[in-house]
Amino acid sequence: MLRFVRGNLLEAPVEALVNTVNTVGVMGKGVALQFKRAFPDNYQAYVKACERGQVQIGRIFVYDRGPLAQPRYIFNFPTKKHWRHPSRMEYVEEGLKDLVCRIQELRVRSIALPPLGAGNGGLPWPEVKQRIQEALEALEGVEVWVYEPVENPKAHSIVPLKTKPRLTPARAALLKLFGLYGALGEPLGRLEAQKLAYFLQEAGLDLKLDFACKQFGPYAEPLNHVLARLEGHYIQGFGDRTGISQIRLKPQALDEAVLFLADYPKADEAATRAADWVKGFETPYGLELLATVHWAVRHEGARDWASLQKRLQAWNPRKATFPKTHLQVALDALLKRGALRPEEWQDRPPKLPANVAQEA
């Protein structure tokens, strides 16, 4: 029996669940991220299978959790080769053929699957739905639940990792910086989290993040994996990256971080220093502006106004439109607060707008 339903796939009372994956061992968004958190044993087995080349288009990687587990089986269904690429309809079609074989081979009597490739994969749901119907409706004695696309899950409903990750100096300092930044109770988004982590590393704490200049300023993809691990234990609202993040510290998280940092004064000082650098720039645009100017001067050798403007124009059209008055305010703050050394800027000091100069 084939039925199309809505709700939480992970709560389906079935013998097997289908998880959509890529072939390179990454579960970073959407349904896959939910599975990674809910079934870490499956994730570890999937990563090892990818390393061995066992996860391929048209081949379901089945993970057996044992006869007493609910669900017993996780069917990892590749809908794309690389996590950066979109899903392809022919991959779904090939996978459905193997899915039918695996269901029959294992004598599965009930199974639930997501809208294969129609979420983050970008495939049109009506066409995917038709392929699913054609492939699975003829199965006899099998109850098939197909979960249709709905809005991205709310960040607070994302399943956290089952094991609380331990604090490290880097994680604790990041949590403290988030707490100082959000002292007024406002949540922060992924852009702000990226820029805060950038300044924390520039403040002297090696987070082992390799930042690069991206559309909205310095960006390090691995930071998202760090935040995903902290989600549900120390922070809430990061989500699965398919919607807007509204990150807040969970109750007691800041206290835990501060207590932990008592034994790591250098990490504690870096968090305090980074928080001081960003004062007055506590908006997504403000942090983007500040981090962009800092990056251009420190990492791309902009030493005067002409070279700074040239770097921004080469970055992208968005950066080229930053008003000079905004650049002056950002550069002045970075120099006066010690985020940039005096010798890093060889041109005349920034001339602040009259209203800003009076406030200073």
UniProtKB/Swiss-Prot annotation:
InterPro entries: ADP-ribose_metab_enzymes, Macro_dom, Macro_dom-like
EC top class named in words: hydrolase
Region (Interaction with DarT): 167-338
Molecular functions (GO terms): hydrolase activity
UniProt entry keywords in alphabetical sequence: Hydrolase, Toxin-antitoxin system
Species classification: Bacteria, Thermotogati, Deinococcota, Deinococci, Thermales
Assigned EC number: 3.2.2.-
Ligand binding (ADP-D-ribose): 8-9, 20-22, 31-34, 79, 117-121
Family matches, as SMART domains: A1pp
Phenotype for K29E: Reduced de-ADP-ribosylation (of macro domain fragment)
The protein, known as: DNA ADP-ribosyl glycohydrolase
